[in-house]
């Protein structure tokens, strides 16, 4: 069984930070031939409003390791974690198991477990006497695209 380090940094967002409004093109971006008639901005969006539903309960953490790659979480990605959300079956969570942080998919049934999203890693089935604390639900993953 492989283990991965997942938690490398916490950073709490500033609650009074100004809005960062970015142009939003309302026409969907086709992954085929673009339409030149649809290249105008219709509104702007604030990334804080889009990504942070509960500012006082939201924080960022940097992912480390490869156990969640099939869930779109890569080594070095920035995760947005919301402590106000209830962790449910199937949610990707930041958990602390016996004092070690990990990001995994929460499985509540048929047996409680923390599931990786990479077949090279084994599920973590919760055993009697283990301490599990869910720190929050991962709501967004931010990563750069691979260039060239």
Question: Which positions does each model-derived feature cover?
Answer:
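Short, positionally conserved secondary-structure boundary motifs
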Residues: 1-69, 100-101, 113, 135, ...
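Catalytic Cys-His active-site segments of thiol-dependent hydrolases/isopeptidases
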Residues: 113-119
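Flexible, small-/acidic-enriched active-site or ligand-binding loops
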Residues: 119-125
């Amino acid at each position: 069984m492989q283990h991965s380090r997942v938690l490398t940094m916490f950073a709490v967002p500033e609650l009074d930070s100004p809005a960062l409004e970015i142009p939003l093109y309302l026409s969907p971006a086709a992954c085929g031939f673009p339409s030149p008639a649809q290249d105008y901005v219709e509104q702007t969006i604030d990334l804080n409003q889009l990504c942070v539903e509960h500012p006082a309960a939201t924080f960022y953490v940097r992912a480390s390791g490869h156990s969640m790659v099939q869930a779109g979480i890569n080594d070095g990605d920035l995760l947005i974690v919301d402590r106000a959300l209830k962790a449910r079956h199937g949610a990707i969570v930041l958990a602390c198991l016996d004092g070690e942080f990990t990001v995994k998919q929460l499985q509540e049934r048929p047996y409680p477990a923390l599931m990786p999203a990479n077949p090279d890693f084994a599920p973590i089935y919760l055993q009697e006497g283990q301490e599990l604390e869910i720190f929050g639900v991962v709501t967004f993953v931010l990563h750069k695209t691979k260039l060239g």
